[in-house]
Amino acid sequence: MRAAISRRFPTAPGFPRDAGAYLKGVEDAYVADAYHSLSIEGYRVSLELIERVRSGNWNPEVHEHDREQTNAMAARGYWQSFQVVKKSIGRVMGGENPGTVAEVGHREWYREMFAPSVAAGILKPADLAGYRGGQVYIRQSMHVPPSRDAVRDAMPAFFDLLTQETDPAVRVVLGHFVFAYIHPYMDGNGRMARFLMNLMMAASGYPWVVSPLAERGAYMAALEKASVGEDIGPFADLLASLVGKRLAGEPLPAVPKKSI
């Protein structure tokens, strides 16, 4: 898989010299990233909702609508998780190994992603501790993720490999793919995998990449081919194309101004 990935990817720009400028670029990508990442997972979000929860105008203890609105909780959780992912990127900018940063940080990303469900009384804090405690299945996929017991062995091994990996493209592609393949949580695995992918992007100076909703079919088909057909090529091609567009200065995928 490694050779198939490396020859497809653009050359890495190298470690960013200006960490502040890089992090500003990440922040500027937030709205597009939140809209497309959440929409890929089936949530119905809008520019207005994303901006509202980001501004802090979200309170399930006061507003019943926010407590009952699944989309609002997902959007708020995405914003909270995005903040700690940025902190992880800051640690990588400070010279820490991206694999180590991901291993330590991904649990906090996950807790923040579902913290609004805890605030609304839907989940208990204990529900967010550790990896999944049961089997998970992926809709419209022939891939069956490992058992809960296998996950406990697979995740440390995964992070060990990620920590030792030196090829920027391999870190990006396999970081996303293997996390999604293991599916360590009952929910949120796609969002987590894309966060992990972008942390690996930052480690080599690639810009933050947004997976467009319009390419959801190709994205899911490429993951399926890698998971079931053991062919990482289409997935590597898809990510390489997105990276290439960003390096060429193309704008991020658009966000509709009206609610969907």
What is the role of each PLM region?
Residues 1-260:
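FIC/Doc superfamily catalytic core
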